[in-house]
Amino acid sequence: MKTPHRRYWVFFLLFLFTAIAYVDRVNMSVAGKPIAHEFGLSPIALGYLFSSFLWAYVLMMLPGGRLIDRWGSHVVASVATAIWSAAQMATGMVGSFATMLMARLGLGIGEAPFAPISYGSVRAWSPYTERGTAIAAISAGSSLGLALGAPVVAWLIETLSWRWSFIITGAVGFVWVLVWLALISTPEKTRWLPQAERELILASRDAGVEPPSHDGVGYRGLIRCPAMWGLFISQGCLVYTGYLYLSWLPNYLQTARHLSMLNSGIYTAIPFLVATATGIVANGAGDKLLTAEAVRAGKRRYLVALSLLFMAAGLAIPFVQSLAGVIALITIAVSAAHVGPAANGALVGDLLRSPGDAGRAFAFLVLGGNTFGLLAPIVTGYVVAATGSFNSAFAVAGALALVGAVAALALARGTLGEHPQPALARPRLAD
């Protein structure tokens, strides 16, 4: 008898969760030009505004991971989404640059547990053989949210105003919260989940992992693992490039390529639309090709490193004159920037030996990504102000991609969440 697949509805809701989060992020990027005009902002000030939600996002990341480990992803998801949706709506009602920064900080507080929620939910709801595909499918919500959000937000701005674009997109999040609260709990408690599927999930999600004899090693134990730092650095290099394009691509197309608001939204959509399919296909192939032994050995790091090498395509952008050529290179870089983080998230699950540390490990991974990511809009703003072009900004992102590939290959191996053996218990070498 074939096992049902109702768990996919959880992944679909998380896909929408991700899409909504990224529509709310790209809204500021598309609206950047009219906001800068209304408040008289320089490229440097605009860079700080683009980055501002990440300040709170990064600061609240580790506390968010602890909340997930304590209360569960399903509970934290609804509270976090309500907070960030309220902040998104408030952004459309501000009267000054200072109050806009405060609203963006509220968005960061709400979105801080967003990625650990997704990663933790996948680990709770999927067999290990589906882990990479599930995370890639959920992560595809980010690229699809950007692909659809950019032109829709551009249309809302041209049709109504930049203020209404924030109010409308923020309201969508509250609809998602109502659906999530009505349908989702844990696999053990969700009533609409067939018993056969429940047993499959519970029996196979920790396949190959010895049942832990402890509650976890906590943040202190995780940061002692070289693998955690390899994941941290590679995720940072991936997310830096992702935020460069998320924050500045519409503005780049409007100012450097002289496209209209609506056309900049349409061209921004192209790389992220392609990235939607690329992320699912590449990570799905990884799941198919990796054996259980390869998963436990951390072989998924090769997919992470390959993604980073493709992401370095951005180094060639300054040497290409045609708009079509630039969009093609950006599409390669953005697609790679969506394949890599999903693979890295699955790799954390592969290497983790203590389920009690799942929320903290995923939070630390995302902290690495966004520690680098919050710098991307600011660094780019200074570069554009100093040079009058985006060329050096693309070069910085390409160089970081190469650094990340080395970190993934050299460090992201071994295990996470194991207590070291006491010195007296270790076997002695023969004399």
Where in this protein do the model-derived segments appear?
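Extracytoplasmic
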Residues: 9-43, 114, 245-250
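Extracytoplasmic gate region of multi-pass secondary transporters
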Residues: 28-29, 224-282, 341-345, 376
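Helix-breaking motifs and short loop linkers at transmembrane-helix boundaries and internal kinks
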Residues: 40, 72, 93-99, 110, ...
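Conserved MFS/SLC helix-loop-helix module at the cytosolic interface between two early adjacent transmembrane helices
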Residues: 59-98
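Cytoplasmic helix-loop-helix junction between adjacent transmembrane helices
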Residues: 103-143
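Helix-loop-helix hairpin linking two adjacent transmembrane segments in secondary transporters
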Residues: 138-191
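C-terminal transmembrane helical hairpin of 12-TM major facilitator-type secondary transporters
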Residues: 297-344
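A late C-terminal transmembrane helix in Major Facilitator Superfamily
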Residues: 352-387
